Amino acid sequence: MLESIQAVQAPYYGDVSYRTPPPDLPSLLLKERIIYLGMPLFSSDDVKRQVGFDVTELIIAQLLYLEFDNPEKPIYFYINSTGTSWYTGDAIGYETEAFAICDTMRYIKPPVHTICIGQAMGTAAMILSGGTPGNRASLPHATIVLNQPRTGAQGQASDIQIRAKEVLANKRTMLEIFARNTGQDPDRLARDTDRMLYMTPAQAVEYGLIDRVLDSRKDLPAPLPSFS
């Protein structure tokens, strides 16, 4: 005989209209001072409407909030992103999106631990390298890719020319940030970013993009807070 099936019921606390909805996953992570960048940095308003939020604005808001919450405790910033480009290197966003995140990371007081999981391409690799020195890391099978900005410009010749000048200016800024974060010579960085340069985590350590390769959270300089 089949046993009767009974539904598992949660306790009821007051009127349904006053119930507190369960927190979403990003909010739970933020409570533990964890930020996750898991998509490209789009600049298109149409894409932002489809996604439902502005990735760059969200990351910056989280960084600023965590400093306000506690300016002494570290922030853990996980990165799995192609930055402002697709896997092919074709532009889908402006480099200024990544510059804004890098500037905010340097502006705030808490140490920022950057950890690559999966991949960090182009401007995402720049963000990865912008963590607090000694606290930049990657999981063992991630990929770090260097490449330079592309125009992706369309329209009239004058518009393309204006965009091309902006791309060159952004490239110089990007090389300056990489040089500051890695200690590499800007001329070498210019050569290495001329084409896509794929690196293993060990190679990224040697290059100065990160400081260590992690096998587990125990390898972090400071332990991650546990979920309660």
Curated annotation (Swiss-Prot):
Gene Ontology MF: a single term = ATP-dependent peptidase activity
GO CC terms, sorted? cytoplasm; endopeptidase Clp complex
What InterPro entries does the annotation carry? ClpP, ClpP/crotonase-like_dom_sf, ClpP/TepA
Q: Which GO terms describe its biological process?
A: protein quality control for misfolded or incompletely synthesized proteins
CDD domains for this protein: S14_ClpP_2
Briefly, what is this protein's role? Has lost the two conserved residues (Ser and His) proposed to be part of the active site. Therefore it could be inactive.
Q: Which family does this protein fall into?
A: Belongs to the peptidase S14 family.
Q: What protein name is recorded for this chain?
A: Putative ATP-dependent Clp protease proteolytic subunit-like
